[in-house]
Amino acid sequence: MYHQLILMALIGVIMANVVPFSMSNIPEEYKEFIPEEVKNFYKNLTQEDRQILRELASKHATFTNEDAALEALKNKSDKLYQKAVELRNFVKAKIDSLKPDAKAFVDEIIAKVRSLRPEDGQKLDVEKLKQAARDIIAKYEALNEETKEELKAPFPNTTKIITNEKFTRIANSFLQKN
C-alpha cells in the first residue's frame, strides 16, 4: 500500500511504475508535495537497497499481490523489508482511520492506479494514466464536503497538492486531451 499519494495515491503509485529510487530524480517543484515519511524512506536507501528495489520492480507482474512482493523483498533484504513494512503500516493506519466513504474512495483510487501498471516489457500508457487521473479527480469532486474534509486530516500533503495553484496548473496542462 505504499504506492500512493496524489489524491491519496496518484503521484506515489504512478511513481511506483517509474520508481525513482532517489529523491534527486524528482523535480524540485514536486518535492514539496511528498510526505516526509516517503522522503525519509528514499533518503535512507543505500545503493544496494535501490538495486534490490529496481530488480523487484522489474518483476512486479510476477507477484500475485502486495504480500508476495514484500515476501520477495524480505528474501533479498530483511532491513529493507522492515523499512517498507514500516512505511506501508504508516499509510495503512491512515487509511484505516477513515470513515467508510472516505476509505472506499481511497481504496478505489489505489485499485485504479495499480491497474495502470504496465505488463513486463511494456511502457506506461500515458493516455490511460491521464484518463485515470481525470476519473479520480471527477470522483473526488463528486465527494460530499464532509468526506473531503475527512481526507484532509490524515493526508495533509494530498490536501496541499489538491489546493496548490502551481500543481493545479501543471496537472491541468498534463491532463489535456491530445
From Swiss-Prot:
Can the keyword Glycoprotein be found in this entry's annotation? yes
- What does the PTM comment of the record read? N-glycosylated.
Signal peptide positions (record):
1-16
**What PANTHER family does the record point to?**
FATTY-ACID AND RETINOL-BINDING PROTEIN 1
Q: Output this protein's name.
A: Fatty-acid and retinol-binding protein 1
Task: Spell out the GO cellular component terms annotated for this protein, sorted alphabetically and separated by semicolons.
Answer: extracellular region
Q: Which domain of life is it from?
A: Eukaryota
Question: In UniProt terms, what function does this protein have?
Answer: Binds retinol and different fatty acids.
Q: Which family does it belong to?
A: Belongs to the fatty-acid and retinol-binding protein (FARBP) family.
Question: At which residues is glycosylation annotated?
Answer: 44, 75, 157
| Native source species | Acanthocheilonema viteae
Q: Where does it localize?
A: Secreted
Q: List the disulfide bonds.
A: none
List the taxonomic lineage.
Answer: Eukaryota, Metazoa, Ecdysozoa, Nematoda, Chromadorea
